Protein backbone atom coordinates (compact mmCIF):
# COMPACT_ATOMS: atom_id res chain seq x y z
CA UNK A 1 0.00 0.00 0.00
CA UNK A 2 1.29 3.46 -0.89
CA UNK A 3 2.17 5.87 1.92
CA UNK A 4 -0.65 8.15 3.01
CA UNK A 5 -0.58 11.66 1.59
CA UNK A 6 -0.52 14.78 3.76
CA UNK A 7 -4.03 15.75 2.70
CA UNK A 8 -5.34 12.27 3.53
CA UNK A 9 -3.74 12.45 6.98
CA UNK A 10 -5.31 15.89 7.48
CA UNK A 11 -8.71 14.58 6.35
CA UNK A 12 -8.50 11.62 8.75
CA UNK A 13 -7.51 13.91 11.62
CA UNK A 14 -10.43 16.26 10.97
CA UNK A 15 -12.85 13.37 10.58
CA UNK A 16 -11.71 11.72 13.80
CA UNK A 17 -11.89 15.00 15.71
CA UNK A 18 -15.61 14.98 15.05
CA UNK A 19 -16.15 11.29 15.71
CA UNK A 20 -13.93 10.68 18.73
CA UNK A 21 -16.58 11.80 21.23
CA UNK A 22 -19.13 9.48 19.64
CA UNK A 23 -16.73 6.52 19.77
CA UNK A 24 -15.67 7.15 23.38
CA UNK A 25 -19.27 7.44 24.57
CA UNK A 26 -20.13 4.22 22.71
CA UNK A 27 -17.20 2.34 24.30
CA UNK A 28 -18.20 3.45 27.80
CA UNK A 29 -21.89 2.70 27.22
CA UNK A 30 -21.09 -0.77 25.90
CA UNK A 31 -18.79 -1.49 28.85
CA UNK A 32 -21.58 -0.70 31.29
CA UNK A 33 -19.02 0.18 33.96
CA UNK A 34 -16.50 2.87 34.73
CA UNK A 35 -13.13 2.65 33.00
CA UNK A 36 -9.85 4.52 33.26
CA UNK A 37 -8.16 6.18 30.29
CA UNK A 38 -5.76 3.40 29.33
CA UNK A 39 -8.57 0.83 29.54
CA UNK A 40 -10.67 2.98 27.23
CA UNK A 41 -7.76 3.34 24.80
CA UNK A 42 -7.33 -0.46 24.73
CA UNK A 43 -11.07 -0.93 24.14
CA UNK A 44 -10.97 1.52 21.22
CA UNK A 45 -7.97 -0.28 19.74
CA UNK A 46 -9.78 -3.62 20.13
CA UNK A 47 -12.56 -2.25 17.90
CA UNK A 48 -10.31 -2.93 14.92
CA UNK A 49 -8.08 -1.05 12.53
CA UNK A 50 -10.12 2.11 12.98
CA UNK A 51 -8.79 2.23 16.53
CA UNK A 52 -5.35 2.84 15.10
CA UNK A 53 -6.51 6.30 14.07
CA UNK A 54 -6.77 7.23 17.75
CA UNK A 55 -3.50 8.07 19.39
CA UNK A 56 -3.69 6.99 23.04
CA UNK A 57 -2.79 10.44 24.36
CA UNK A 58 -5.39 12.09 22.12
CA UNK A 59 -8.33 10.55 23.98
CA UNK A 60 -7.61 12.36 27.26
CA UNK A 61 -8.58 15.87 26.09
CA UNK A 62 -11.79 14.42 24.61
CA UNK A 63 -12.57 12.60 27.88
CA UNK A 64 -11.99 15.83 29.82
CA UNK A 65 -14.27 17.73 27.44
CA UNK A 66 -17.03 15.11 27.75
CA UNK A 67 -16.63 15.23 31.53
CA UNK A 68 -16.83 19.04 31.60
CA UNK A 69 -19.94 18.88 29.40
CA UNK A 70 -21.65 16.54 31.87
CA UNK A 71 -21.73 13.59 29.46
CA UNK A 72 -19.27 11.67 31.63
CA UNK A 73 -18.68 11.51 35.37
CA UNK A 74 -15.17 10.94 36.65
CA UNK A 75 -13.39 10.16 39.87
CA UNK A 76 -9.75 9.70 40.81
CA UNK A 77 -8.56 6.63 42.68
CA UNK A 78 -5.12 5.80 44.00
CA UNK A 79 -3.37 3.02 42.13
CA UNK A 80 -1.27 0.31 43.76
CA UNK A 81 1.14 0.66 40.84
CA UNK A 82 1.92 4.07 39.38
CA UNK A 83 0.04 7.34 39.51
CA UNK A 84 -3.64 7.69 40.51
CA UNK A 85 -6.17 6.73 37.86
CA UNK A 86 -9.12 8.78 36.69
CA UNK A 87 -12.15 6.59 36.09
CA UNK A 88 -14.89 7.68 33.69
CA UNK A 89 -18.52 6.61 33.53
CA UNK A 90 -21.21 7.69 31.08
CA UNK A 91 -24.04 9.77 32.59
CA UNK A 92 -27.73 9.62 31.69
CA UNK A 93 -27.16 12.85 29.72
CA UNK A 94 -24.26 11.07 27.98
CA UNK A 95 -26.53 8.16 27.05
CA UNK A 96 -29.06 10.62 25.60
CA UNK A 97 -26.30 12.38 23.64
CA UNK A 98 -25.00 9.03 22.39
CA UNK A 99 -28.47 8.10 21.15
CA UNK A 100 -28.85 11.47 19.39
CA UNK A 101 -25.35 11.32 17.90
CA UNK A 102 -25.90 7.77 16.62
CA UNK A 103 -28.92 9.04 14.70
CA UNK A 104 -26.94 12.00 13.36
CA UNK A 105 -24.07 9.68 12.36
CA UNK A 106 -26.48 7.32 10.56
CA UNK A 107 -28.00 10.24 8.64
CA UNK A 108 -24.57 11.66 7.77
CA UNK A 109 -23.20 8.27 6.71
CA UNK A 110 -26.18 7.70 4.42
CA UNK A 111 -25.79 11.20 2.94
CA UNK A 112 -22.07 10.69 2.26
CA UNK A 113 -22.62 7.19 0.85
CA UNK A 114 -25.30 8.56 -1.47
CA UNK A 115 -23.01 11.39 -2.60
CA UNK A 116 -20.12 9.01 -3.26
CA UNK A 117 -22.21 6.40 -5.06
CA UNK A 118 -24.58 8.65 -7.03
CA UNK A 119 -24.05 8.01 -10.72
CA UNK A 120 -20.69 6.34 -10.20
CA UNK A 121 -17.31 7.99 -10.40
CA UNK A 122 -16.70 10.04 -13.55
CA UNK A 123 -12.93 10.03 -13.04
CA UNK A 124 -10.90 7.07 -11.88
CA UNK A 125 -7.66 7.67 -10.01
CA UNK A 126 -4.68 6.19 -11.80
CA UNK A 127 -1.61 6.04 -9.55
CA UNK A 128 1.67 6.95 -11.23
CA UNK A 129 4.07 4.12 -11.74
Q: Can you name each region flagged by the protein language model?
A:
Residues 80, 84-102:
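Basic, amphipathic "hinge/linker" alpha-helix immediately C-terminal to the N-terminal HTH DNA-binding motif
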Residues 74:
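Short beta-strand "wing" residues that participate in macromolecule-binding interfaces
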Residues 60-64:
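Short, hydrophobic-biased segments on the C-terminal half of alpha helices
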Residues 1-19:
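Intrinsically disordered, low-complexity serine/threonine- and proline-rich regulatory segments
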Residues 13-58:
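N-terminal helix-turn-helix DNA-binding core of bacterial DNA-binding proteins
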Residues 96-129:
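Amphipathic alpha-helical dimerization/coiled-coil segments
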Residues 70:
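Glycine-centered, phosphate/nucleic-acid-interacting loop/turn motifs that mediate DNA/RNA or nucleotide
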